[in-house]
Amino acid sequence: MDWVPAHFPKDEHGLAYFDGTPLFECKERRMAEHPEWGTLIFDYASDQVQSFLISSACKFFEEYHIDGIRVDAVSSMLYLNYGRRDGEWTPNREGGYVNLDAVAFLQKLNRTILVNYPGAITIAEESTAFPLITAPPENGGLGFCFKWDMGFMHDTLDYMQLDPYFRSFNHDRLTFSMMYAFSENYILAYSHDEVVHCKNSMINKMSGDYDQKFASLRTLYGYQFAHPGKKLTFMGGEFGQFIEWNWQQPLDWLLLGYPKHEALRQYCRELNRLYRGEDVFYRCDNSWDGFRWLNVNDRDRSTIAFLRTYPGAEGGVVCVCNFTPVRNDDFVIGLPHAGTLHEILNSDDERFGGAGVHNEGTIRSHHAGFLDMEHSARITVPPLSCVYFRYKVRKNHK
């Protein structure tokens, strides 16, 4: 559930100057108002305000049995100078810009929820590089279970809106997320925030004609599911709704009567099924031990390949994504050990609305080095596609 302790409206029937004094908001007038949103900011130093907010969250867990909360606009809580110019904010007691009272409040909030509601999750929507969002409070962290990976979302969506010709010049947008992927426990979220306010729906963000939009979205979802981190896709994106989300009307379920939309839904269903069945996707999700690049720098063909695995696994799943409308034959990927590849998912499958370009049978590795690996394999990658292969290491070749 989206839960917002960062600010509240000035409406006279609400909490603003509740008893004629700044009861819920900051006592210092210039720090009480959010300069960008025109709302009021809670006084996190107040025990009464802390009790009110934490009780609010607990109420939803106890009475409505929610699974977790997503705390909105955490960045605006953490920085005293958020949205403010020099001279418009007051430093903390240590002379810095971090809102120490908000930090203490978030730590208390997470401790309270995770102790009293075992199995609950707390998620921070935080868009900066503030450290230790998902670290335990006793280690100096805020104590959240997960943090939304805003960087992955922005980079991949910006990339997918580019004409494929220009993607080679922006290859880093695909790969940069792995520079920080294990610094927090991330959720890769394509949320409601990205399909409102004239930002376009997920399918309409994709570059190209009608067929290419569907192929591109299948490729993007395939990359999202194989990338380290948990997954979140807002409703409607799984079957390619063309209009933006409107809270005042239902989704366009009638689109499932059209082959391309139903095929996309089937593809998303298969991604979920495969994700549940292949533990390499989540067993080692927060360490380089679970991920290895197999081909990362082929910017000319805008194609990447990587391995998901875990320590002790006899192989894993290889993911290859082609972000151009050009078929790549004899595409080379490195392999850490001799073994075989067998295609287990192909977004270009005719079942999912594709053209049906496959890798038939078993592909065997060659003792030909590639990048820093001693072995390699040659595969076919369809245009605008994501292909998963089951990789089995040949015995006695580890």
Regions found by a protein language model. Give the residues of each.
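Catalytic cores of secreted or luminal carbohydrate-active enzymes
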Residues: P259-F281
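C-terminal beta-strand-rich structural cap/linker in extracellular carbohydrate-active enzymes
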Residues: E360-K398
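Alpha-helical packing segments of well-folded alpha/beta enzyme cores
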Residues: V49-F60, F105, L109, L220, ...
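Extended carbohydrate-recognition surfaces in non-catalytic/accessory domains of CAZymes
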Residues: L256, R351-H367
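Conserved, mostly hydrophobic/aromatic
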Residues: D2, L53, F60, V71, ...
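Substrate-binding/active-site clefts of carbohydrate-active enzymes
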Residues: M1-Y97, I363, I379
